[in-house]
């Protein structure tokens, strides 16, 4: 009987990428297949996030739930990876003695060896070291599950924002060699991937050697240009970027590379210079707006999303008003916004915080309501227009229909003959938008040339 692995992922796209790699590593080494049901698994892995306290505590809550599974199946192995593993290390085993494996983002490729050591010794294995970027040299070729894929181009972050734990859990910035990234993207394209999302904690800081051991360095703009030249790749996204390193060369890439989508996620974190300084972000609101102004001079319809932290220590009503003014001016399409969560070991954790929790919550609700109004307005403005979408697969709402994604990252559901589904999935097609809903759009095929052939055969 085929053994199975269950992976639960918390947090960012970097973790989603890492989770896929965990499955690939275990499949190549031990023939394990992925399962969506922990009860069916022989190995259960939690890929964790420590950006906020709530996410961190949820991991231990989930661990408590799978403890019963281990009692019923003694051979079951339980592992904790990701940023909580890096931060907590062996203390995870002290708190949850039934955990067998603790590993960091940079050591997931060692999972097969850790599993062997656990079985031989009977003791929990902990490896949260930072071995540069060696994991990419030990990962098997990616297995594709659709026309879009994540590709990690670097690890870590060297910005050390005062509130952020990432540099301590993922290490400083280390870039993959250019040819290594291009080889992975080309391999994905050969398997039918049409859209890649280039991943890093701060992709703007990418400085990859042209090849392993080379002294010549490629910046992020160069990487994008090379990826765009790979046959089969029709769309390029990236996340996350940092305003401080948004160079003119990267801005110019939006004019040079049509395959770079008309959507940008650029975290601002706050709209007050005073708070940005306390966060150690390294830029002012004016400098942030200058980047957007230059980008929209090239791409007037550029869709913009961001991250925002409400209730940072010392935030006044005036600071929050400045944040809201920026939200209105930038017309953000989406925002990942949260109340500030102090993380142990970060400088901001020691700052005095005298803002009541209910005030923070009220501010967050106001911010999110405003963003939702923006989302609804932008979605409604797309009704009646023809959008180019990448067809990703059957619609979640109705498997008899198909779903795809626009450049500004909206899901579009549309009817298509069942017989045409295999031909259309993975294709770029035109869809006329007829209706806008809170979290999706609905449209109809605009049949031209190959699209018409695909839809009728």
Curated annotation (Swiss-Prot):
Domain MTTase N-terminal: 3-120
Domain Radical SAM core: 143-377
Catalysed reactions, as listed in the record: N(6)-dimethylallyladenosine(37) in tRNA + (sulfur carrier)-SH + AH2 + 2 S-adenosyl-L-methionine = 2-methylsulfanyl-N(6)-dimethylallyladenosine(37) in tRNA + (sulfur carrier)-H + 5'-deoxyadenosine + L-methionine + A + S-adenosyl-L-homocysteine + 2 H(+)
Subunit-level organization: Monomer.
GO terms under cellular component: cytosol
Domain TRAM as annotated: residue spans: 380-447
Principal location: cytoplasm
Cofactor annotation remark: Binds 2 [4Fe-4S] clusters. One cluster is coordinated with 3 cysteines and an exchangeable S-adenosyl-L-methionine.
Residues engaged in binding [4Fe-4S] cluster 2: 157, 161, 164
Residues annotated for [4Fe-4S] cluster 1 binding in this entry: 12, 49, 83
Function summary: Catalyzes the methylthiolation of N6-(dimethylallyl)adenosine (i(6)A), leading to the formation of 2-methylthio-N6-(dimethylallyl)adenosine (ms(2)i(6)A) at position 37 in tRNAs that read codons beginning with uridine.
Subcellular location: Cytoplasm
Cofactor: [4Fe-4S] cluster
NCBIfam families per the UniProt record, alphabetical: miaB-methiolase, MiaB/RimO family radical SAM methylthiotransferase
Classification via Gene3D superfamilies: Methylthiotransferase, N-terminal domain, tm_1862 like domain
Protein name: tRNA-2-methylthio-N(6)-dimethylallyladenosine synthase
Keywords of the record: 4Fe-4S, Cytoplasm, Iron, Iron-sulfur, Metal-binding, S-adenosyl-L-methionine, Transferase, tRNA processing
UniProt xrefs under PANTHER family: CDK5 REGULATORY SUBUNIT-ASSOCIATED PROTEIN 1 (PTHR43020), MITOCHONDRIAL TRNA METHYLTHIOTRANSFERASE CDK5RAP1 (PTHR43020:SF2)
Top EC class, one word: transferase
A Gene Ontology molecular function term of the record: metal ion binding
Family the UniProt entry places it in: Belongs to the methylthiotransferase family. MiaB subfamily.
Enzyme Commission number, as recorded: 2.8.4.3
